[in-house]
Amino acid sequence: MKSWLLLLGTIGWVTAGDVLFIPSTLYPVHAQTMSVLARELAERGHKVTWLEIGPERSDIVLHQQVSREFWPAQFGDRTLQEIYQFKNHTSHSELWNPQYTNENEQTTGWLASIRLCDSVLSRSKSKFDKMVEKQFSTVIVDDLYNSCGVLMAGLKKSVYIYWSMTGLRTESAWANQSPSPPSYLPVAGTGLTDDLTFSQRLYNVASYFKQLYIHQHIVQPRIDAVFQKYYPGVESTFEIERNASINFVNTPPIFDFSRPYMPRVNFIGAIQCRKPKELPKEFTSWISAYPDGFVVLSTGFTVQWNKSPEHIRQAYLDTFKYLPNLLFIWQTGLPNSSNLPSNLLVKPWLPLQDLLGHQKCRCHVSHGGLNSVIESVYHGVPVVGVPLTSRGYDNLLRITARDSGVMVEKSEFSGEILTAAINEVIENEKYKKEMLIFQDMVIDVPYTELYHAAFWVEFIERHQEVPHARSGADHLNFLQYFLVDVIAFFFFVIFCTLSIIYYTIRTVFRTIRSVVNGVRGVPKIVSRGKKNN
């Protein structure tokens, strides 16, 4: 018996790893998503360390066995503080402006993360060095707005997982060598589907090279400057990103438009999704009073409702009044008041998955946040999308392209339009039917995405590297990757061949012409001679 216990203990010791998580702190949803995998690994017996670098420690609740570290850092810029820390920047009220798409969100986020990284290294480089010296079997790094996370992965020289909290973006696909043909694959932020006209393909190609240029020639050089400032000689950001052992993507495999990708890319979207739990009595008492069901309205961490224009809030309230037979459960920080419609339940935060999984949930009004949209698919609830940013628009396109919901543009937004959209989704059975088909394709797999993600972490711990998952493209430059050198060589050969043929033919014709002219010219000369005689 003792020998069996010893064997089991040895097996547990061998298989359990030491994992370091480094999430981005600019957007809480990133850490919230990563915490799900951290909890799973801790429950499997792994030693998990969680490192946050930012102006404030997040409110994310971690598993009790997760070792948590927080290193304070400052932006050193008032505008960045207002955007990410105080959330009182004008951009929060501009979200509802039809012309505002927040297309510079990604560049601004990276520049903010560079300042945070510079700040923490200037204050706590000794802490950083000690963390580098610690032995971890795997490092898991958020691939957005996480400069110090990239540096940690590069300095440790250990295997690491690069986790995209969005879909597989252009620059991420370039780093892991997954082909992203702009001929049919829409670039993030373009608002396009995979059915492109000629003019749309022109725009898509321009957007493709623009995103690569911004990341590789604006963002990465600034990150490298900070790296070289504190660690001269360290690898470039480009090389560190390319050296990731595994890439996680925060979308289900069939959520996005069909695309090619490398074997080291694993789609683990819906990792946070689960079966619904029983709702608190406060919700059930409201829901039971409305036989026609209820509608959920959520905006996640994105919208500061106290910054929204009055006419926007009034449009929502008008919608609730137009549909008195439905209960509306609205996630908003606005205070309760006697002026609110009687069919409205207001909460600052919602048990969203428990509500979406309830049998009386009729539809989900979403701003287009990736996690909330995926949760709608997972629970089979059609969506009415009100996109506030270009990223949200892209996420909702994946729903509307499959007839699993409708979208209301900001430029058309009103109480009447929103009411019509909700009625359309609820009364037209097509949307529910298509969403259930979409749901079935996402969940009809022999494992959960959480199990899938945990498997790959443990796979990397056991094997350390996956050489067969890498391609020869890792060693190619831009011109070689797109076969510019080969195409140029072919054109050169064709040009030389055609030139040789041309000059050969011209020479032959000139020779023939001169011979002919020579033959014709002899009699004339002779006749003249005779005449002179």
Swiss-Prot record:
Q: In which family does this protein belong, per the annotation? A: Belongs to the UDP-glycosyltransferase family.
Provide the top EC class: transferase
The species is: Caenorhabditis elegans
Q: Keywords in UniProt for this one? A: Glycoprotein, Glycosyltransferase, Membrane, Signal, Transferase, Transmembrane, Transmembrane helix
UniProt keyword annotation of Glycoprotein present? yes
| Location (main, coarse) | membrane
User: Which residues are modified by glycosylation?
Assistant: 88, 243, 336
Q: What is this protein called?
A: Putative UDP-glucuronosyltransferase ugt-58
Q: What kind of membrane protein is this, topologically?
A: Single-pass membrane protein
> Which molecular-function annotations from GO does this UniProt entry contain?
glucuronosyltransferase activity; UDP-glycosyltransferase activity
Annotated compartments = Membrane
Encoded by which gene? ugt-58
Presence of keyword Nucleus? no
May I have one GO cellular component term?
A: membrane
Signal peptide location in the record? 1-16
> Which chemical reaction does it catalyze?
glucuronate acceptor + UDP-alpha-D-glucuronate = acceptor beta-D-glucuronoside + UDP + H(+)
**Which segments cross the bilayer?**
481-501
Please provide an example of a Pfam family that matches this protein in its UniProt record. Answer: UDPGT
- Report the EC number(s), separated by commas if there are several: 2.4.1.17
Q: Which InterPro entries match?
A: UDP-glycosyltransferase (IPR050271), UDP_glucos_trans (IPR002213), UDP_glycos_trans_CS (IPR035595)
